[in-house]
């Protein structure tokens, strides 16, 4: 699930911002995706991604009627979830690094409860902060604390079991009159059903909802692609590398693209 109010026209480097979030899910082996956005953007998303058949995936689309918080995405997606574990991804969160995919696969081995990622950051007060006790057990999770007790924050990629639906159902709105994702995590924590997976040092996280971080992400992606000689955030290439589409199908997709730098880079690698 990609749940965030992100316009389809928002781009980083030479492709839509949503490509990066979707690329991470593809590399993690996710084949069914529900896009949740504003009603006005749904037709744009459909035009951009279609049914998913071209990538041997399945895409569905729906919208959030009213902005009442991130956990509302779980309410909206009840039928899609269908009593199965799922991923809730915020489309404006970018993760770049070699070890990221292997970490995602470890997280997906968790079948009961919830799992979150943790990343060390210079500005922890911008996000939910994790505090451990001496035994490395989670002591607390506090949303945007004024005086953070650690530099470990939770980025926007969450893993839940089917019980998250009842958890969200029992949530009460915060002072902002919204449902808070940190309350979902605290509910699992109280039951000792929340696991944390720390990202390795090679993984960079960017919250591109911040204009400055979007610029930083763009520059970092440029350097990363140049150094690794790989195309980062390519849903077509990632689907091919997963074995979901053939080289012939990949080339057909490339030929159907309008002329762009992205098409040139993808053609060179295919």
Predicted feature residues:
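Single conserved hydrophobic/aromatic residue that forms the stacking wall/gate
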Residues: 1-7, 12
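Structural beta-sheet core signal
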Residues: 34-35, 88, 114-117, 196
């Amino acid at each position: 699930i990609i749940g965030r109010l992100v316009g389809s026209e928002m781009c980083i480097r030479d492709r839509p911002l949503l490509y990066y979030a979707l690329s991470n899910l593809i590399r993690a082996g996710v084949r069914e995706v529900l896009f949740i956005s504003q009603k006005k953007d749904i037709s744009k998303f459909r035009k951009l991604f279609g049914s998913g058949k071209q990538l041997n995936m399945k895409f569905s689309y729906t919208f959030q009627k009213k902005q009442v918080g991130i956990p509302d995405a779980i309410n909206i997606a009840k039928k899609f979830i269908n009593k199965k574990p799922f991923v809730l991804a915020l489309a404006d969160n970018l993760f770049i690094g070699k070890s990221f995919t292997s970490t995602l696969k470890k997280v997906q081995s968790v079948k009961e409860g919830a799992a979150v990622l943790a990343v060390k950051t210079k500005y922890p007060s911008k996000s939910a902060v994790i505090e451990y006790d001496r035994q490395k057990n989670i002591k607390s999770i506090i949303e945007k604390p004024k005086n953070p007790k650690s530099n470990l924050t939770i980025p926007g990629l969450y893993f839940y079991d089917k019980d998250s639906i009842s958890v969200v159902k029992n949530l009460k709105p915060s002072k902002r009159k919204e449902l808070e994702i940190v309350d979902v995590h605290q509910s699992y924590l109280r039951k000792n059903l929340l696991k944390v997976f720390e990202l390795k040092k090679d993984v960079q996280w960017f919250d591109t909802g911040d204009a400055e971080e979007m610029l930083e992400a763009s520059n970092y992606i440029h350097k990363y692609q140049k150094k690794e000689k790989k195309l980062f955030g390519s849903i077509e290439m990632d689907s091919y590398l997963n074995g979901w589409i053939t080289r012939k199908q990949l080339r057909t997709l490339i030929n159907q693209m309008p002329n762009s730098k992205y098409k040139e880079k993808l053609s060179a690698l295919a």
